[in-house]
Regions:
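Glycine-rich phosphate/pyrophosphate-binding loop and the adjoining helix
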Residues: 88-140
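Helix-loop-strand module that forms the ligand-binding subsite of alpha/beta enzymes
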Residues: 5-92
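Glycine- (often His-adjacent) and acidic-residue-rich active-site loop
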Residues: 1-3
Length: 140
């Protein structure tokens, strides 16, 4: 049926994702990919993937928009590309159009992003883009 048989908080996450107009997912890069916490949450959508792609029953019918924000201490594009591919797969499962992304390399410490006004400006612009796209999805 596309729902996980494990009784934990993923059912709350599924409900929120079903109801949302937009989703911005953010994660740091650890060991060349998404954080373990982010990845395990995405892995819990495997039941939804099976439902949509094997059983042909889409439990995330509502169209939505989405974006991905990712930070890394390293300046490795391949790390970001790896994370992006995982997030794009999630967005396909939940019917979210991948509207944009923000990759912020060179960030090691908490608050360090404040030294990079270009990252802050890009994050603001991405937020405006996602809000506009979500508004366009709502019925008039």
């Amino acid at each position: 049926d596309g729902l996980s048989p494990i009784e934990d908080d993923i059912h709350i996450v599924y409900k929120k994702v079903k109801e949302c107009d937009a989703l911005i997912l953010a994660s740091p890069i650890f060991f060349g990919s998404l954080s373990a916490q982010t990845k395990i949450m995405i892995d819990r959508f495997q039941c939804a993937w099976v439902s949509k792609n094997i059983l042909k029953k889409d439990i995330f019918k509502k169209k939505k928009t989405g974006a991905f924000i990712c930070t890394s201490a390293a300046h490795r594009k391949d790390f970001f590309q790896n994370a992006r591919s995982i997030v794009r797969n999630l967005f396909q499962v939940i019917n979210a159009k991948y509207e944009g992304e923000l990759f912020c390399p060179g960030l090691e410490k908490k608050g360090e992003v404040k030294k990079y006004p270009e990252f802050l400006e890009s994050a603001y612009d991405l937020g405006k883009k996602i809000a506009s796209a979500a508004k366009d999805l709502r019925p008039s």
